[in-house]
């Protein structure tokens, strides 16, 4: 997988453009953090960010995508973890987990993809691990619901917190 991506530390693929499907419903990109970024470069393999666009939700007024899941690779290119990043990381329009189920079930950015094999793999992963992804999204919702509303804005902007929740593949 890492050979296909051919992405060095600090780079983003499939540069210079990310992958957005032909219907403008789904979007993904892959990147690796700089080697010195110890908090985000734990596995050395980088990670994918998967999004649903405002168009998928019928939201023509929003310009912000909604982050579905991040998929981390280990240093050998194998599956390392799934995680939900903090809002400052993705600058997204967060939505409750219940509204994201359909997007996770239907995620497919194969049309118009310069990286067809990877797009197929990502679609298969979201279906194979659908229940686990939904559990992470629900965990995020429970965590945030327990947090006083007045503290959320500060939490979302705290650059020391890059991941809200994570499931590591052991």
Each predicted region: which residue ranges?
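Aromatic- and glycine-enriched beta-alpha-beta binding-site module
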Residues: 14-82
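N-terminal domain-onset segments
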Residues: 1-20
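Mixed-charge (acidic/basic) macromolecular-recognition segments
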Residues: 78-170
């Amino acid at each position: 997988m890492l050979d296909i991506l051919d992405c060095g530390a600090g780079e983003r693929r499939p540069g210079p453009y990310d992958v957005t499907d032909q219907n403008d419903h789904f979007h993904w990109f892959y990147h690796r953090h700089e080697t010195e970024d110890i908090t985000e470069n734990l596995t050395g393999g980088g990670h994918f960010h998967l999004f649903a666009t405002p168009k998928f939700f019928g939201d023509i007024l929003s310009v912000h995508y909604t982050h579905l899941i991040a998929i981390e690779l280990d240093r050998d290119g194998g599956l390392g973890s799934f995680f939900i990043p903090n809002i400052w990381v993705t600058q997204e329009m967060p939505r409750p987990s219940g509204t994201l189920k359909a997007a996770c079930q239907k995620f497919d950015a194969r049309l118009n993809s310069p990286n067809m094999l990877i797009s197929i793999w990502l679609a298969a992963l979201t279906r194979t691990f659908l229940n686990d992804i939904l559990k992470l999204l629900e965990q995020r919702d429970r965590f945030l619901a327990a947090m006083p509303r007045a503290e959320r804005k500060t939490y979302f902007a705290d650059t020391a917190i890059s991941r809200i929740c994570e499931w590591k593949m052991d």
